[in-house]
Regions:
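Charged, solvent-exposed interaction patches on well-folded alpha/beta domains
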Residues: 3-171
Length: 171
């Protein structure tokens, strides 16, 4: 229950208004009961009452749910430009962002403001198709990406391995 209002009306009536939380995401490690509403506020509820499979999982330090919710809303349309969705968004205790896409790609976004993180992600999304096509892959083949580097990024693709100096394959 988000808010309950009780008013007395003349002559002998009582008007009760109940506002419920509308869950938009699951929160933290305890996704069985913790959820986030449209204002970024964490609340407790029974996850069985909603379709939890359709909700993203957000996590971060205590008291940072509003910031995480705002970043989710900022990153979601950026990823949508390449037909990717956000399954999970995490803010580490040290302030570093990590997103898991609906294709199970884990992208390390690093620290910074929304604009800084968003700019790194946009540069990555503009160039990743060129990189993946060199290996006859698509952007859905991205297994992991690390965007914390100053002038580039590290990328791991499904089905692509490297050879070490000894000729043995390395994942």
């Amino acid at each position: 229950m988000r808010k309950a209002t009780v008013r007395r009306e003349f002559p002998n009536r009582i008007r009760v208004r109940l506002d419920e939380h509308q869950p938009v995401a699951l929160w933290g490690e305890n996704t069985e009961t913790s959820m986030v509403n449209q204002d970024g506020v964490v609340f407790e509820a029974n996850v069985d009452d909603i379709d939890a499979d359709q909700l993203p999982v957000l996590s971060g330090p205590a008291g940072q749910s509003v910031l995480v919710w705002q970043m989710y809303n900022y990153l979601k349309p950026i990823l949508a430009t390449v037909s990717m969705g956000v399954d999970k968004l995490e803010l580490s205790p040290r302030g570093s962002w990590r997103v898991q896409t609906d294709s199970d790609a884990m992208i390390e976004l690093g620290r910074g403001t929304q604009e800084e993180v968003g700019q790194r992600l946009q540069v990555f999304l503009k160039t990743v198709a060129q990189v993946t096509s060199r290996y006859q892959r698509t952007t859905n083949s991205v297994l992991a990406a690390d965007l914390r580097h100053t002038n580039g990024y590290a990328l791991r693709l499904r089905g692509v391995t490297t050879l070490g100096n000894d000729g043995n394959k390395k994942p």
